[in-house]
Regions:
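Conserved pre-motif I regulatory segment
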Residues: 1-31
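Hydrophobic residues on the short alpha-helix immediately C-terminal to a glycine-rich phosphate/catalytic loop
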Residues: 22, 41-49, 71, 153
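Pre-Walker A (Motif I) flank of P-loop NTPase domains
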Residues: 24-30, 55-57, 114-115
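Walker A/P-loop
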Residues: 25-45
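Conserved Walker A/P-loop ATP-binding site and its immediately adjacent core
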Residues: 39-44, 54-77
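Conserved helix-turn-beta segment of the N-terminal RecA-like "Helicase ATP-binding" lobe
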Residues: 66-100
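Conserved two-lobed SF2 helicase motor
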Residues: 109-127
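SF2 helicase catalytic motif II
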Residues: 121-124, 129-166
Length: 169
């Protein structure tokens, strides 16, 4: 995996503390004020995970399509040489689907690649139905994760993903 040195941000103490906790706990809440660098915590953690000799699949969940696309752009400023999928109904130049079978197929043709999947809370159940093995999942604006329609998929990934983190302000 190539990790871009461009736009490398010096992490602040609270971000380093969050990353240290993420290294030792498989499940947790990361509470950082708006503008405090939650996205950079996710990106830095993903970079660490992608250094593993075994390929990893990381899912990033956002409340809106626009934010999912924005997070994708931010991640890809710092992480390259990964397979990227979007699971939502919005437009993107990456592979995109809302069909669980298509996502399963995409996953199967990228067995040796690190993978980033960007989705919304509305479409998270599509990833659950695809049976893609998720190593790490980041829930952005995590207060959305407990809404009645979203909770079953949230609960599934909090129990079944190797690592699960809820980011909120």
């Amino acid at each position: 995996m190539n990790i871009s040195n461009e736009n490398t941000m010096q992490l602040r103490p609270h971000q380093l503390e969050a990353l240290d906790k993420m290294n030792t706990k498989r499940l947790g809440q990361i509470i950082v004020p708006t503008g405090g660098g939650k996205t950079m915590c996710m990106i830095e953690d993903a970079k660490r995970q992608f250094k593993s000799p075994v390929s990893k699949t990381i899912v990033v969940v956002a409340p809106r399509i626009l934010l999912a696309n924005q997070l994708s752009s931010e991640f890809l400023e710092h992480i390259t040489n990964v397979a990227v999928a979007h699971v939502h109904s919005g437009e993107t130049h990456h592979f995109s689907t809302t069909n669980s079978i298509d996502l399963t197929h995409w996953d199967s043709i990228n067995p040796h690649h690190n993978k980033l999947i960007f989705t919304t809370y509305h479409s998270l159940h599509k990833i659950q139905n695809s049976m893609v093995d998720v190593d790490t999942i980041y829930f952005d604006e995590a207060h959305n994760s407990v809404q009645k329609n979203f909770y079953p998929a949230t609960e599934h990934f909090s129990r079944n993903a190797d690592r699960c983190y809820f980011f909120t302000a």
